[in-house]
Amino acid sequence: MIKFDERLKELRKEKGVTQREIAEFLGIKTRPYQNYESGDRRPDYEKLVALADYFDVTTDYLLGRD
């Protein structure tokens, strides 16, 4: 089962966007987003849903429950 941080990084690279671009979309600074990709932090529910919408995937997929 793939972990959330790995899935998030994989999706970002597939879409060809930077961490900064996604952070701006979420309305946060780049560092907190980097913490999501490094596994140091998890987004709150609202940000998780926003990420799923951004990448056009389900929250289950993001969380590695595919």
What do these predicted regions represent?
Residues 27, 46-61:
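DNA major-groove recognition helix of helix-turn-helix/homeodomain DNA-binding modules
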Residues 17-35:
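Short alpha-helical DNA-recognition segment
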Residues 11, 25, 36, 65:
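Residues in the recognition helix of alpha-helical DNA-binding motifs
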